[in-house]
Amino acid sequence: MAIFRDQAENHVEHDRSIEDRRRHRQLVEKSIKENLGDILSEESIIGETKNKKYKIPIRGIKEYQFIYGANNKGVTTGTGEERRGDRISSDKRKAISNNKAGNQEGKDIYETEITLEELMDYIVEDLDLPNLDRKKYSEIIVESAAKKRGYQKYGVRPRLAKKKTVMCKIARKQGKKRALREIGEEAEIGRFPFREDDLRYYKVKKHPKKESNAVMIFIMDVSGSMDNTKKYLARSFFFVLSRFIRRKYNNVAFEFISHTTTAKNVNEYEFFHKGESGGTYISSGINAAIDLIKEKYNPGVWNIYPFYASDGDNWSEDNEKAMEAVNEISDLSNMFGYIELLPSTYSTTMFYRFKKEISKKNFVSVTVKEKKDLWNAIKYMLSEELQEKNKE
């Protein structure tokens, strides 16, 4: 005897497409995270608006099905390292690789689009700004978001409290019924429209709150040894970093410094677009940041995070001054980050000297040897684990 069950009342639990949709979302998120490095290495990302779209390849999901084997003898087993979706086979057919021909079935690939704003959402998931220390007198007074504090009879339409308005209308209607019953009349009331007196609006009040001061100081070497590729890598690093921080925090100040043998404060547009040439004194850029800190950002009041990008090619007479400057700015800062771009010879760049001679716990240095290293450098600089280690 056949038994039929009606699943109409709880059809969601028996919707077979739910699992497919969940797996599809996982694949999309996985592909986006795996391609973050490629997106961030695009030169077009610098200065783009939040609605700029980027294409990301995603492997398609196929329905499970039985297929014919190759009539090979023996039994195929796994190695224990397989993941969901891997094909276990002893087939010797070769896949297409290195742009050469093969004889194995390909994978379905399609593209999805993601905006720069959505890209920042995924970056926020993986990265975290160094914790802002609560310093004495370090708070600034900012206006918090408005909070609802009761009701009032006047206000703007967006703040109309609909539920409270309906309750006032019902109370007025019930009051009228009681009045009619008291004078002996029929209490049945027909159409009962809203009146101006029924309207209630949310009363909002903005409360000041304290937030920690934080300033990010971006310093970039724009000398002749910094070719277009190096400058692009530096600007990409700073651009993504600034977008991420602005998205995560509302009250962070930014300062921009570019230098050759001399340094100068520039605005954000000049920092990301203007190029120069000349010799290199690393100390000039760092000393300019030190002067700026002493002038505007008291370390007892501000949380200070300078980041410096260079190819590490410094004029030899300036090396000792550069070492002194790095030590001094590290003492003034919560963290000082040094990014060295496309170093030609490891042992001759400032990265080697800094690693060997700078013992400050809050000094963090990375190298970017090619475009694909950019994303790892950003993660390394801002990883929460790294910051916790630096505090110890």
UniProtKB/Swiss-Prot annotation:
InterPro entries per record: Spore_YhbH, UPF0229, vWFA_dom_sf
Pfam families in the cross-refs: DUF444
Segments for region (Disordered): 75-100
Biased composition range(s): Basic and acidic residues: 80-94
Coiled coil: none
UniProt cross-references to PANTHER family, sorted A to Z: UPF0229 PROTEIN YEAH
Family classification: Belongs to the UPF0229 family.
Protein's name according to its UniProt entry: UPF0229 protein CPF_1540
Organism: Clostridium perfringens (strain ATCC 13124 / DSM 756 / JCM 1290 / NCIMB 6125 / NCTC 8237 / Type A)
High-level lineage: Bacteria, Bacillati, Bacillota, Clostridia, Eubacteriales
